[in-house]
Amino acid sequence: MSLFPVFVVFGLSFPPIFFELILSLAIFWLVRKLLAPTGIYDFVWHPALFNTALYCCLFYLISRMFV
């Protein structure tokens, strides 16, 4: 259960997990932009799978902070 209530914006209701998803997506974009110049993607076997796992880990960390 999250600490945040359901948000209603212009008649649309958004569950608290929606904002956690958006926040983790913003952090994911930032981390991906920081990792790209380092050349870490040269050592990754499957970049799309790596990005998916990175996003899942970030989402888990963000969601654990708000519980």
From Swiss-Prot:
Keywords: Cell membrane, Membrane, Transmembrane, Transmembrane helix. The keyword ATP-binding does not apply. This is Protein AaeX. Belongs to the AaeX family. The keyword ATP-binding does not apply. It is found in: Cell membrane. Pfam families: DUF1656 (PF07869). The chain crosses the membrane at residues 3-23, 43-63. InterPro entries: DUF1656. GO terms for cellular component: plasma membrane. It is a multi-pass membrane protein. The gene is aaeX. Its main location: membrane.
